[in-house]
């Protein structure tokens, strides 16, 4: 698949999963979020990734949220399904369940907690890719998984036909260059770090899977639209205004701050998260509110 494939480029939202005060998924609110991002010009949505609280939803809930997101989108925006797990068999089960869901592809995280070797990581993703025809996007986020997938392993996996790209969330932009060199120019690289996302585009990334996008969707869509055509002056102007927000949305564990911010802006009805995640600490809330004001969102 070409690196210019519009399904996997530009401003991609790591979508929150809205919940009510009882911890149940709020599908009415989810539908409104999908509409909001379509109207704002977002290029794609990731349903039930890390920001969507995949770890505290059952497989059945994961699949239902993804299917409803596809239903609400009505073909107007590509939906990428979070389908990772730290057990290869579970990731395969999830991927198979999504076969006829209408998703554009799957985002699959490096196995967390059990810390596989590079060979184990390779075999994990190879087994998942072999169970489906859906395009697969690898997801490397060692700060959360405890394992770092090396560029050399990515290059091996890039030889598998339906492994088409990676969400690289180390925040080390030199990785973008290294992966492009080893995996080839047609292998899609998406930044997973808002603070360095624009720099990643300058170094050859095709887009960004963004947390900030949840609450600054139009600004983010505009910024990456400018960046991808080389108008970095306009892109930098937007990015400077959002930089405090990029950082403060991680002042506590994601998605705690972004859910509170989305609630503060009226995008969702509740900032509720499922345990063990709890809502944003009261003493931290003014800092995030200040970041929203600096960004021009309040």
Swiss-Prot record:
The active site is at residues 139, 167. The record marks 50, 113 as: Part of a proton relay during catalysis. It catalyses: L-aspartate 4-semialdehyde + pyruvate = (2S,4S)-4-hydroxy-2,3,4,5-tetrahydrodipicolinate + H2O + H(+). One of its GO terms (biological process) is diaminopimelate biosynthetic process. It is an enzyme of class 4 (lyase). Pyruvate binds at residues 51, 209. One of its GO terms (cellular component) is cytosol. Transmembrane segments: none annotated. Keywords: Amino-acid biosynthesis, Cytoplasm, Diaminopimelate biosynthesis, Lyase, Lysine biosynthesis, Schiff base. Its EC number is 4.3.3.7. It is found in: Cytoplasm. GO terms for molecular function: 4-hydroxy-tetrahydrodipicolinate synthase activity. InterPro entries: Aldolase_TIM (IPR013785), DapA (IPR005263), DapA-like (IPR002220), Schiff_base-form_aldolases_AS (IPR020625), Schiff_base-form_aldolases_CS (IPR020624). Pathway: Amino-acid biosynthesis; L-lysine biosynthesis via DAP pathway; (S)-tetrahydrodipicolinate from L-aspartate: step 3/4. Homotetramer; dimer of dimers. Catalyzes the condensation of (S)-aspartate-beta-semialdehyde [(S)-ASA] and pyruvate to 4-hydroxy-tetrahydrodipicolinate (HTPA). Belongs to the DapA family. This is 4-hydroxy-tetrahydrodipicolinate synthase. It comes from Haemophilus influenzae (strain PittEE). The gene is dapA.
């Amino acid at each position: 698949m070409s690196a210019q494939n519009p399904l996997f480029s530009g401003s991609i939202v790591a979508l929150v999963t809205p919940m009510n005060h009882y911890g149940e998924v709020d599908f009415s609110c989810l539908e409104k979020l999908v509409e909001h991002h379509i109207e704002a010009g977002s290029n794609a949505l990731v349903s039930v990734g890390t920001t969507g609280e995949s770890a505290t939803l059952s497989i059945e809930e994961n699949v239902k949220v993804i299917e409803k997101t596809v239903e609400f989108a009505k073909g107007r925006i590509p939906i990428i399904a979070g389908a990772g797990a730290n057990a290869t068999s579970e990731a395969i089960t999830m991927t198979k369940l999504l076969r006829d869901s209408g998703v554009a592809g799957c985002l699959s995280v490096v196995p967390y907690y059990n810390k596989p070797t590079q060979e184990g990581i390779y075999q994990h993703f190879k087994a998942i890719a072999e169970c489906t025809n859906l395009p697969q996007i690898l997801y490397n986020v060692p700060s959360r998984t405890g394992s770092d997938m090396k560029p050399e392993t990515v290059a091996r996996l890039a030889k598998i036909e339906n492994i088409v790209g990676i969400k690289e969330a180390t925040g080390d932009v030199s990785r973008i260059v290294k992966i492009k060199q080893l995996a080839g120019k047609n292998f899609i690289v998406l930044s997973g770090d808002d603070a360095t996302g624009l720099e990643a585009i300058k170094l050859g990334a095709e887009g960004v899977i963004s947390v900030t996008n949840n609450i600054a969707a139009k600004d983010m869509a505009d910024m990456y639209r400018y960046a991808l055509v080389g108008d970095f002056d306009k892109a930098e102007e937007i990015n400077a205004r959002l930089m405090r927000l990029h950082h403060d949305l991680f002042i506590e564990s994601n998605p705690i701050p972004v859910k509170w911010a989305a609630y503060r802006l009226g995008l969702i009805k509740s900032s509720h998260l499922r345990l063990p995640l709890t809502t944003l600490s009261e003493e931290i809330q003014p800092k995030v509110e200040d970041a929203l004001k600096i960004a021009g969102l309040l």
